Amino acid sequence: MNTHMNRRLFSRRRLWAGASLVGTLGIALGVFLWRELNPPATLSPEARAALYQTPLEPPERGLAVYHLGHSLVGPDMPGYVQQLAQAAGHEGARYHSQLGWGTSLRAHWEQEHPEASFAEMNTHTSFRPAHEALVSAEYDAFVFTEMVDLKDAIRWHASGQYAGKWAAHAREHSPEMRLYLYETWHGTDIAEGWLARLEGDLETLWEGTILAQAMARPDVGTIHVIPAGQVMAAFVRALESEGGLPGLKNRHGLFIMQPDGTRDPIHLNDKGKYLVALVHLTTLYHIDPRGLPHALLRADGSAADAPSPEVARLMQEVVWQIVRSLPATGLPQDTGRGGS
């Protein structure tokens, strides 16, 4: 009798579990179909270009910057930006951040963080919860980025809509705050080709999808771009065309070494972080980075593995050239090649 009843209970539980799974899948499918049939509003390329016709004014003082992202932000790179800004005379530069491990803008917004990874990524002293930080109205610039693979993020995590939510949230509490989307990169092992994706994704995905959707909201205004991916592509082409430089032979030398002796395809070492920090500095402050220090400190106070003087010089030259060639950075445009 008990065995028979147990079987009936087990069968019912399986039935309910199956029904629950079907219901969950049905909801997910419904959301997907709704998004496919009701795409978000987007700005045309002409409307986006019009937003960037007038450059931003260079900041007159050190900026308070808030960074939202994942491991391609990390605890070290924002600190490099602060040190470089201070070396350039902006003593008041400071920052806070909230990071996740491969976290999307949607997951940050909904606070859907796996506890272990969220705690691991935010042990640094500059952590401050994102919603609290933006509501405080204590920041001059808000820099945010999306997870990669970017195509998956756009399709499954509604990148443009959540970029718009974050931007509108920041604007609500600080109308004059400068907003920046930090363009990152995919792994060097990506099937479509690393340089091809870097050079194609800026217009197609970062600007043409994420920003076009985000800036279609009337409460967002202009979001500028920190073009780290474009700089990385240009730097790698320049570096490899010269056959490498002291301390850096090719693109792979920008990425961390894994325990098995192979290079991580996406996470930067100190040299790569320095390059990305230069892009942030130049975009945020309109500063010519040439001649700035290349020996910096990590977030834990230890000395970073500095690029050689030759590598640092090429990085600085490429950053200054590329950032001034893209209207979305907010800098006055220079159509020359590497001039002063």
Predicted regions, residues:
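Conserved SGNH/GDSL esterase-like catalytic core that processes O-acyl groups on lipids
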Residues: 75-161
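Conserved catalytic region of serine esterases and O-acyltransferases that act on ester linkages
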Residues: 32-34, 249-340
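Structured segments of extracytoplasmic/periplasmic soluble domains
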Residues: 71, 75, 80-91, 145, ...
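Hydrophobic alpha-helical membrane-insertion segments, chiefly the h-region
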Residues: 24-34
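Serine-esterase "nucleophile elbow" of acetyl-processing enzymes
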Residues: 37-102
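N-terminal Sec-pathway targeting helices
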Residues: 6-24
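Acidic/histidine-rich, surface-exposed loop or edge segments in extracytoplasmic proteins
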Residues: 59-67, 140-151, 301
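Alpha-helical cap/lid subdomain in secreted, periplasmic
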Residues: 128-270, 282
